[in-house]
Amino acid sequence: MESSGKMESGAGQQPQPPQPFLPPAACFFATAAAAAAAAAAAAAQSAQQQQQQQAPQQQAPQLSPVADGQPSGGGHKSAAKQVKRQRSSSPELMRCKRRLNFSGFGYSLPQQQPAAVARRNERERNRVKLVNLGFATLREHVPNGAANKKMSKVETLRSAVEYIRALQQLLDEHDAVSAAFQAGVLSPTISPNYSNDLNSMAGSPVSSYSSDEGSYDPLSPEEQELLDFTNWF
């Protein structure tokens, strides 16, 4: 019974497939090395072909004919000059050039100004010179101006304004005195009785002017003080 059972179980099992043959380790590494060498050779060949394709393109400008002693690759140089000119005209680079001092290198950058800028600068210099000369002349005519050489322009103008006001006040007083004296000169042409009546009036301006006509001093003490303009400043 047991043998029949084993036979039935053996008949019921399927046969197993044969296992594949595994090569040894040396054969595996040799195969991998051969594949890597083939890949490297293919990569080197493709790189060499690319270099051969790029070589004629690089040598074409060098083998081109020469005109006027310059190579035909002027397009590249002109483009480089344009880029350099654009960079040099930028305001940031111009400011850097102004800050740099090239005297230590033995040369200096040429500074060329347009004609309009040069004329404008010349006019400005002439204007400043005339203004300074005008203030110097005004400083000589104001009181204490000639002695004070360090008087500023504002102080010179202020002193000139005060000096003009003092002269105007003195001129007004002189005109008033002249008008009064003219009235006193015309008084003798009036009738004697009228002149006597006027002289008899005490404190009248006409009597004082007529009585002081012979002994009139052109400059009174008050007027002499007004002439001293240094007291006004």
UniProtKB/Swiss-Prot annotation:
Tissue specificity: Developing CNS and PNS at embryonic and postnatal stages.
Residue span of region Disordered: 1-24, 39-95
Domain bHLH: start-end pairs: 115-167
Record key words, sorted: Acetylation, Activator, Developmental protein, Differentiation, DNA-binding, Neurogenesis, Nucleus, Transcription, Transcription regulation
Residue stretches of biased makeup (Basic residues): 78-87
A single cellular component GO annotation: RNA polymerase II transcription regulator complex
Residues annotated as signal peptide: none
GO molecular function: bHLH transcription factor binding; chromatin binding; DNA-binding transcription factor activity; DNA-binding transcription factor activity, RNA polymerase II-specific; DNA-binding transcription repressor activity, RNA polymerase II-specific; double-stranded DNA binding; E-box binding; identical protein binding
Gene Ontology process terms (BP): adrenal chromaffin cell differentiation; carotid body glomus cell differentiation; cell maturation; cellular response to magnetism; central nervous system neuron development; cerebral cortex development; cerebral cortex GABAergic interneuron differentiation; commitment of neuronal cell to specific neuron type in forebrain
Pfam assignment, any one: HLH
Positions with biased composition (Low complexity): 39-62
Cell compartments where the protein resides: Nucleus
Covalent S-S links between cysteines: none
Modification sites for N6-acetyllysine: K153
Summary of the function given for this chain in its UniProt record: Transcription factor that plays a key role in neuronal differentiation: acts as a pioneer transcription factor, accessing closed chromatin to allow other factors to bind and activate neural pathways. Directly binds the E box motif (5'-CANNTG-3') on promoters and promotes transcription of neuronal genes. The combination of three transcription factors, ASCL1, POU3F2/BRN2 and MYT1L, is sufficient to reprogram fibroblasts and other somatic cells into induced neuronal (iN) cells in vitro.
Known partners and oligomeric status: Efficient DNA binding requires dimerization with another bHLH protein. Forms a heterodimer with TCF3.
Annotated protein name in UniProt: Achaete-scute homolog 1
